A protein has these predicted regions:
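Hydrophobic, aromatic-enriched interface-forming segments
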Residues: 130-222
Length: 321
């Protein structure tokens, strides 16, 4: 089911603020809306901040790839869960659950190729691939081009934990919007000093991360369990490496310390290479007081209960794998 708002267009001469996520999808949404000359500034937000009302949203705002918040002028999304969560159809909520990215929803809404004839080559295909996680094993283990850019822009890769870069992620995003609008090739973009600084660190960590994952992994039937509790440092890596290293697994479970080792966190996900897992991860985590969506979720436990809960959850996953 899709909600569309085909009659709502930006007011002539009006400039809006874009509120989006700081990732590849957010970047391309910003490029598209800048091409239309309808945004003057960008705010990057986390989905939970939107749900918790921490971001003030009003009639001068356009949101993309974020939970729907009433009050925005237009809201674009492609998450099926939002159709359920938003419940009532809102005239300003453009949601196409079958679209691979929110950028694709924006692109199609404003007229596609006819409206955007000058986009950087390959950018729409790249954002669709990244946001739908349609990566190959080779993309994951030897990333280059747009795939590499998407991994260094993903906060979950974790590069920011290890270095104060020359410019912040926000400044980099703003720079990349302009470089993509100037129709630079992806090769040119990867040569930018502020991008190269991040890709160099990515590859430096990549080797250590692969060795760490292989060392910490234990296979439980179709599930790979990664226990990082004895690791002093968890190296930065794209979040799909575990699936490329263990192609026989269709799910992963990461065991991590909570804040100050006061509790234990389980982060559970489905493989993007072996897409045979049937269990609803979000529902499983919710049953333990956590949450998530169909393909990924987290829950946390008191340290003393974590081993019992781990065996229980492994059993449930393998029963439904």
């Amino acid at each position: 089911m899709a909600h569309t708002a085909q009659n709502i267009m930006p007011k002539p001469g009006k400039k809006y603020r874009l509120i989006t996520r700081s990732d590849m999808d957010g970047l391309v949404c910003a490029v598209l809306l800048k091409e239309l000359d309808i945004i003057e500034n960008v705010t990057f937000a986390h989905p939970k901040d939107m749900q918790d009302g921490l971001i003030e949203v009003g009639p001068d705002d356009i949101t993309t790839n974020l939970p729907y918040v009433e009050g925005a002028y237009l809201a674009f999304d492609h998450h099926a869960s939002e159709v359920t969560r938003a419940k009532n159809k809102h005239a300003n909520h453009v949601i196409l659950p079958d679209a691979p990215s929110a950028a694709r929803v924006v692109y199609d809404y404003f007229g596609g190729a006819a409206t955007f004839p000058n986009l950087t080559a390959g950018i729409m295909e790249a954002v669709d691939k990244a946001d739908a996680a349609q990566f190959t094993k080779d993309d994951i283990l030897s990333p280059k081009g747009w795939e590499l850019l998407s991994f260094i822009m993903d906060g979950r890769t974790g590069l920011g934990r290890f270095k104060d870069f020359n410019i912040s992620n926000y400044q980099l995003m703003m720079k990349l919007i302009e470089h993509c609008r100037d129709h630079d090739t992806i090769e040119d973009i990867l040569k930018l000093p502020d991008v190269k600084e991040r890709t160099d660190l990515y590859f430096e960590h990549h080797i250590k991360a692969k060795a760490q994952i292989e060392r910490c992994a234990k296979i439980e039937e179709k599930l790979v369990v990664l226990d990082f509790r004895k690791e002093e440092t968890i190296w930065a890596a794209n979040r799909f490496i575990v699936y490329a290293l263990f192609p026989q697994a269709n799910m992963s479970l990461h065991i991590l310390w909570g804040k100050n080792k006061q509790n234990t966190i389980f982060a559970i996900g489905k493989s993007i290479l072996n897409r045979t897992a049937k269990i609803d991860v979000g529902a499983l985590c919710l049953s333990y007081g956590g949450g998530g969506h169909n393909a990924a979720g987290t829950c946390q436990f008191e340290n003393i209960k974590s081993e019992d809960k781990l065996h229980e959850i492994i059993g449930k996953i393998n029963k439904n794998a």
